[in-house]
Amino acid sequence: MAACTAQVLSLYRKLMKESNKFPSYNYRTYALRRVQDAFRANRSVEDPKMVEQLLNQGRDNLDMIRRQVAIGKMYPTQKTIVEG
């Protein structure tokens, strides 16, 4: 279980780090909030099969975030008032 916990924490850190790379404030805050909410919602899951399934889903989401960040950097937009 310790290895599993380490994998979950590693995935969480990677997701948060990648989500912070969004150039757009709105996308960045949305992605960060979604990652936090998903991990909080599944905090009590202990079934190894379910944990593995959630890890795979998280890895897929990490790949998606990386692609979206790359696309967002290719097509920059004007900063919002919140971004200053």
From Swiss-Prot:
Belongs to the complex I LYR family. It comes from the Eukaryota. Disulfide bonds: none annotated. It comes from Salmo salar (Atlantic salmon). Pfam families: Complex1_LYR. CDD domains: Complex1_LYR_LYRM4 (cd20264). This is LYR motif-containing protein 4B. GO terms for biological process: iron-sulfur cluster assembly. Transmembrane segments: none annotated. The gene is lyrm4b. GO terms for cellular component: L-cysteine desulfurase complex; mitochondrion.
